[in-house]
Amino acid sequence: MSETLIKFGTSFQSKIIASLLSDKKFIQAIIDILKPSMFDSDSNKWLVKSIQDYYFEYKKQPTLEVLKCSIEEMDNDVLKSGVVEKLRETWKHIEATELDFVQKKTLDFCKNQTLKNAILESVNL
């Protein structure tokens, strides 16, 4: 079983990020088990980490304005350009009709990864 969300594709990953930004119940359910390393692109990893960092500090999702400010502070122009493009793509999915399906699949995937990692760690003890 793959440890990343690559098998679901880039559009699916954008919908996960859209869900993180738009659905309070989803972010509350998944914030502790979703890892940026599960995403395939550096841009998606950066977005997920930024959303998580903001959520852990302020207990709510960042707005588009907050993300824009964070992007402006980036030093890496190549990554900055990629993040802007991914955020545009993500924003197109904010009201996608299949977000419930995406959220369920993502939650199941993350729970399985967490369980798998816990089992592997216990074997190493």
Go through each PLM region and give its residues.
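Short secondary-structure subsegments characteristic of cysteine-rich extracellular domains
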Residues: T114-L125
